[in-house]
């Protein structure tokens, strides 16, 4: 399974408190709710616990509340992941294979839903702290349960728009995602979140 799948099945600060700060939760919720749709390009870098690069990819994404997302990773590790709000389709053109599964609405299992899902559930799922410097607001999210894809997630905003995301897993592997060309609240066609599986492709239902 490719490392890119860690983010979407398709994104730490050290000063933490034991419980979510109400002001930090409210601020993060406001920033997220302001963007009903998001489009952006991204570059993703994954490092192991010692800092060795494991993978570097680029691509583009489109998100829309509630629960809709399109995430395309460019070649050579090309993949497309699309959610219609109920199910997620992962298309691997190299394998000519489509994997279809029910959308896991838990924010700790599907980080993309932090940007496209029900933000009212954030404080139920995470302890949250915020830090602001140089016009950038960093939110650190620590899952409240152990059954998660990551141990820590940092979400950063610049000028009111998401700027980057970092996930750290239990073995110290880091996935850093930088978003560029971010645009919010532009009209997105419904067809963006529907994936037509090519004829003859292998289909796996999970």
Curated annotation (Swiss-Prot):
Coiled coil: none annotated. Participates in the translocation of lipoproteins from the inner membrane to the outer membrane. Only forms a complex with a lipoprotein if the residue after the N-terminal Cys is not an aspartate (The Asp acts as a targeting signal to indicate that the lipoprotein should stay in the inner membrane). One of its GO terms (cellular component) is outer membrane-bounded periplasmic space. Its main location: periplasm. Belongs to the LolA family. It comes from Pseudomonas fluorescens (strain Pf0-1). This is Outer-membrane lipoprotein carrier protein. GO terms for biological process: lipoprotein localization to outer membrane; lipoprotein transport. Keywords: Chaperone, Periplasm, Protein transport, Signal, Transport. NCBIfam families: lolA. It is found in: Periplasm. Pfam families: LolA (PF03548). InterPro entries: LolA/LolB/LppX, OM_lipoprot_carrier_LolA-like, OM_lipoprot_carrier_LolA_Pbac. Monomer. Residues 1-20 form the signal peptide.
